[in-house]
Each structure stands twice: as structure tokens, then as C-alpha cells.
Amino acid sequence: MGFPKEGEKVQIHSYKHNGSIHRMWEETTILKGTQSLVIGANDRTLVTESDGRTWITREPAICYFHANYWFNVIGMLREDGVYYYCNLSSPFAYDLEALKYIDYDLDIKVYPDMTYTLLDEDEYEKHSKMMKYPPVIDTILKRNVEYLRKWIHQRKGPFAPDFVDMWYERYLMYRD
């Protein structure tokens, strides 16, 4: 598996466990790319849903992908602070087409005061049965929910103070 290079513009593709496309982000600028970590940024990028509907993101976002964890984190810069959306997902893969991951339904929304809510447990239960997630996936995802909770409480990784602001400043250097 390769990895995207700094300054490169890539698509992000999210899939479901059964291999079907879930969502695509048209353009994300890579700010850091290594075998184990990718940090990207986008602002007002086109998003295409699996049913063909499209929408445009409303605010700048910093995207954090790690090869050793089963989640990715999007930090969204809004007027009243940074909001985070954490997707429980497979670790990322990259090919010349896009940065890719499998979305496993569960999400954690984190507010600027670092309180958070676990979302979509019902969707996870439904898809787990429908797509026959193996028990090992359930174990891995539950462990990674706990990792995320610890990171949020410890302000670690993408939740560290100034993490999103620092990477957003770097992103501004690449804007056209």
C-alpha cells in the first residue's frame, strides 16, 4: 500500500462491509502522508452519497486517518469552535484512485467542550446482522470506541489543543 504525498489532492471513498460504495469526497488536500498516518483538509468539497445525491461541505475540515486504528476523525472548524465527527471504520488504504476505508456505522460526535455522543448504534446492529459482520469486527470496533473515548478525555492525537488550528494554518498555504 502506498500513501498520498503532501500537497496532493485526493478523493476519499467510504465503503460498506459488503463492498458497496457509501460516500465519496471529491477533493481533499494532503497535509501529511506516511505509511501509518494521513492528515488532509478540505473546505466546501463536493460529497456524493451512495444513492447519487450530492451536497457540499459547509466548513473547513481536517481529516485524520491512521493505519493502526479502526476509526478516522474529522475536525470541523465552526464559528463557535471545533466539532469532531469520528467514524468507526477500517484503517485506511490508499491507491492511485483514492484514500479508502470501510465505514462501520458507529460514530462519535464531539462538541467544542469535549463532551461527546455515541451515534448510530441501531444502524450498526442492523448492518451487523444484514452484512454478517464477523464477531472479531465487533470486538475490534468496541475496543476502538474505548480508544476514542480515552483520546477525547486525554485530548490526544486529533483532539489535542490547537491540532486542528495548526493543520488548518498549513492547509491555507495550499489554497488556490
UniProtKB/Swiss-Prot annotation:
The active site is at residue 23. GO terms for molecular function: magnesium ion binding; nucleoside diphosphate phosphatase activity; ribonucleoside triphosphate phosphatase activity. SUPFAM superfamilies: FomD-like. The keyword Hydrolase applies. Its cofactor is Mg(2+). Mg(2+) 2 binds at residues 105, 107, 120, 123. This is Nucleoside triphosphate/diphosphate phosphatase.
